[in-house]
Amino acid sequence: MDQYLDVKTPWHLWVVGILSLAWNAFGANDYIQTQMGNVAYYETMLEGIDATPEQALAYFQSYPAWMDAAWAVGVWGAVLGSLLLLLRSRFAVLVFALSLLGLAVTTVYQLVQGQPEWAQGTTTTIITVVIWSIATFLLIYAGSMRSKGVLR
């Protein structure tokens, strides 16, 4: 008999999976809105930040193709990782790791290249720390669930 059939799915997997999917869906929406050049979306997202939607879109849309690809891997990898976690697939670990790699590339690019003045500050730093914390947690959590035989 398959050893994974005996492993009961812990209740927290569903909580983590659903919350991570919701969180990462927000990131996916942000990515789509940026790629589509949605000015109205940026008007709501920039409240309290000293930049126009046009300035913000111009900054994000000026990324080189490889950077945009890394951003896509980070965002869509996180969405796929969340779905794979809910499906109890061991591949969630690999996909979350790839997502974290995409996040690392985008973070390093922004640090090396520099960000516009409006994108620097406490709010941006907090958002970056939260994104890194959640992405790291999801990778560790998925790894833990795989080692316990929950992910097959």
Predicted regions and their residues:
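Topology signature of small-to-medium multi-pass alpha-helical membrane proteins
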Residues: M1-R152
